[in-house]
């Protein structure tokens, strides 16, 4: 299935039914009076978060959604039937934006979340409401109100605990295959991952979390180069960022880069930090661990020396790991440490919740 994380739709609520002008007509009752019923309310349009969906691809084929109009009122004080609501299922993590005002009107973060995006019109009043001492036979009724109409932009931000980021071909997809049941496409060329992949990592029988493999970023991602802004926003909800670097990207004796992703390890770190800061400085405040991958492409001692030199040059103080995603060596300790971090984050959040009461 193609991954689609943006869509624009039009939602149209149903108009209210018109009120009825009618008079009671029965034998032996010459002056029955008005008995026109009210029109039914128009149906509304709702968005509902559905955990079974993970893409907005369906909205590429259907963009206009209409709720039913309310039925007109009838004689004998019969009210019109209300129009049926229109329910639109969206993936968890969908942000809803009013295109006309550019206002965020909703954020669907839990399964079953409901959001009213277009309210149906109220049904019109029948003529029975307009009877008075001076107007015993009103021929007046009100039409139903118009339903709301909006154009909405839907943006999907993946709900993942861990977001993996790095330049193309550093081994993110291989890593997610190593630690989860996900099977993203893997090959030895850049941009293998064209859409974000999600994997579930199970630590114990009842302990698991979600990891997102975001497509490789390139310079200018914050400006939209290579669909960068679409991919970067998937990192905003994560609790931890794993910054993957190809440690095998070295230079020859003349200083020419000859293997790896085309950037030296220190450049991979610094250039990506620039993109994160330009897109959303808050991303740099998230816990971010360095994962130095492809250690299997050189002797173990050389890989360790390169890693320690890089950490020293970066003045890196956060956790870092030297791994081989292909052989899975060193990958599991990262996952265990991540689970420990998440448990600590939950404890802190619980304490803050209690203290704020």
Swiss-Prot record:
It comes from Xylella fastidiosa (strain M12). Pfam families: GTP1_OBG (PF01018), MMR_HSR1 (PF01926). It is found in: Cytoplasm. One of its GO terms (biological process) is ribosome biogenesis. Monomer. The gene is obg. It comes from the Bacteria. Residues 1-159 form the Obg domain. It is an enzyme of class 3 (hydrolase). Its EC number is 3.6.5.-. PANTHER family: DEVELOPMENTALLY REGULATED GTP-BINDING PROTEIN-RELATED (PTHR11702), MITOCHONDRIAL RIBOSOME-ASSOCIATED GTPASE 2 (PTHR11702:SF31). Mg(2+) binds at residues 173, 193. Residues 160-343 form the OBG-type G domain. GO terms for molecular function: GTP binding; GTPase activity; magnesium ion binding. Belongs to the TRAFAC class OBG-HflX-like GTPase superfamily. OBG GTPase family. This is GTPase Obg. An essential GTPase which binds GTP, GDP and possibly (p)ppGpp with moderate affinity, with high nucleotide exchange rates and a fairly low GTP hydrolysis rate. Plays a role in control of the cell cycle, stress response, ribosome biogenesis and in those bacteria that undergo differentiation, in morphogenesis control. One of its GO terms (cellular component) is cytoplasm. Its cofactor is Mg(2+). Keywords: Cytoplasm, GTP-binding, Hydrolase, Magnesium, Metal-binding, Nucleotide-binding. InterPro entries: G_OBG (IPR031167), GTP-bd (IPR006073), GTP-bd_Obg/CgtA (IPR014100), GTP1-OBG_CS (IPR006074), GTP1_OBG_dom (IPR006169), GTP1_OBG_dom_sf (IPR036726), OBG_GTPase (IPR045086), P-loop_NTPase (IPR027417). GTP binds at residues 166-173, 191-195, 213-216, 293-296, 324-326.
